[in-house]
């Protein structure tokens, strides 16, 4: 299986990498939170752009991205607009969503973009090609904050992302029971052992699913999300606790 290298970070080998999400509403908060995040122990900074109020002003968005890049130049920067239908803060049109991601790619400020699988097949394929032409990696994602589908469906979605040339397929699902967590872990393991030729990220959300955020190295998830301050999804634990557990499991 091939790994994915972003800056000096190799994703897909060793302990799962820690991603943290910064969710600031304006440029002043972007600056202050970036300074606070700089002291935390994590591997990838995700900027959740859907929390940013001045979204229609592309210059403002990119000015904020520049602050993040300059504050933490060594950290891979993942640019993520999470759509309302997949648990995000704002709803925008597909056209605006694609344009925003293209602007991020054009800026040269971001290392990775998050692209939702169900945006539309043609738009997704074109945006992946555009990102790769500009040396930007793509985390292709799907989120369901209500339920966990069958393992076959989870695997089908991850394989579809892989077929669309995502650098890292990602899926996050809400368990309604403990057995749903096992379904997610079973699907992750089967994907990893039978189909994946690149790193994948999977997680089961909420308190019930926390084990999935810790056991990635065992089952085949290459990264996990932790919280510096406010969690960006239910079930995230603090980065310091997360690093401790990931290290224990890695060294066992």
Swiss-Prot record:
Active site annotation, chain numbering: 143, 170
Keywords for the protein's UniProt record, in alphabetical order: Amino-acid biosynthesis, Aromatic amino acid biosynthesis, Lyase, Schiff base
E.C. number(s) listed in UniProt: 4.2.1.10
UniProt cross-references to Pfam families, sorted A to Z: DHquinase_I
InterPro entries membership: 3-dehydroquinate_DH_AS, Aldolase_TIM, DHquinase_I, Type-I_3-dehydroquinase
Residues engaged in binding 3-dehydroquinate: 21, 46-48, 82, 213, 232, 236
Molecular functions (GO terms): 3-dehydroquinate dehydratase activity
GO biological process, alphabetically ordered: 3,4-dihydroxybenzoate biosynthetic process; amino acid biosynthetic process; aromatic amino acid family biosynthetic process; chorismate biosynthetic process
Pathway(s) served: Metabolic intermediate biosynthesis; chorismate biosynthesis; chorismate from D-erythrose 4-phosphate and phosphoenolpyruvate: step 3/7
SUPFAM superfamilies assigned: Aldolase
Reaction(s) catalysed (UniProt annotation): 3-dehydroquinate = 3-dehydroshikimate + H2O
NCBIfam families for this protein: aroD
Similarity comment text for this entry: Belongs to the type-I 3-dehydroquinase family.
Quaternary state and interactors: Homodimer.
Free-text function comment from the UniProt entry: Involved in the third step of the chorismate pathway, which leads to the biosynthesis of aromatic amino acids. Catalyzes the cis-dehydration of 3-dehydroquinate (DHQ) and introduces the first double bond of the aromatic ring to yield 3-dehydroshikimate.
Name of the protein: 3-dehydroquinate dehydratase
Species this protein is from: Escherichia coli O139:H28 (strain E24377A / ETEC)
Lineage, top ranks: Bacteria, Pseudomonadati, Pseudomonadota, Gammaproteobacteria, Enterobacterales
Gene giving rise to this polypeptide: aroD
């Amino acid at each position: 299986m091939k790994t994915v290298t972003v800056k000096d970070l190799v994703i897909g080998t060793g302990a799962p990498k820690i991603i943290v999400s910064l969710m600031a509403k304006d440029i002043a908060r972007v600056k202050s939170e970036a300074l606070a995040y700089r002291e935390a122990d994590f591997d990838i900074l995700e900027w959740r752009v859907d929390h940013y109020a001045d979204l229609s002003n592309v210059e403002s968005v990119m000015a904020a991205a520049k602050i993040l890049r300059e504050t933490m130049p060594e950290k891979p920067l993942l640019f993520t607009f999470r759509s309302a239908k997949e648990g995000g803060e704002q709803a925008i049109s597909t056209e605006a969503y694609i344009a925003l991601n293209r602007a991020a790619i054009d800026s040269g400020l971001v290392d990775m973009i998050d692209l939702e699988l169900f945006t539309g097949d043609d738009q997704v394929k074109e945006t992946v090609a555009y990102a790769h032409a500009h040396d930007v990696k793509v985390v292709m994602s799907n989120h369901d904050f209500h339920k966990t589908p069958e393992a076959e469906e989870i695997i089908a979605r991850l394989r579809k992302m892989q077929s669309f040339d995502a650098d890292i397929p990602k899926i996050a699902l809400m368990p309604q029971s403990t057995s749903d967590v096992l379904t997610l872990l079973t699907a992750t393991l089967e994907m990893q052992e039978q189909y994946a030729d690149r790193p994948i990220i999977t997680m089961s959300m909420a308190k019930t699913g926390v084990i999935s955020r810790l056991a990635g190295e065992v089952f085949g998830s290459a990264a996990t999300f932790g919280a510096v301050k406010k969690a960006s999804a239910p079930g995230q634990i603090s980065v310091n606790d997360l690093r401790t557990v990931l290290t224990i499991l890695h060294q066992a």
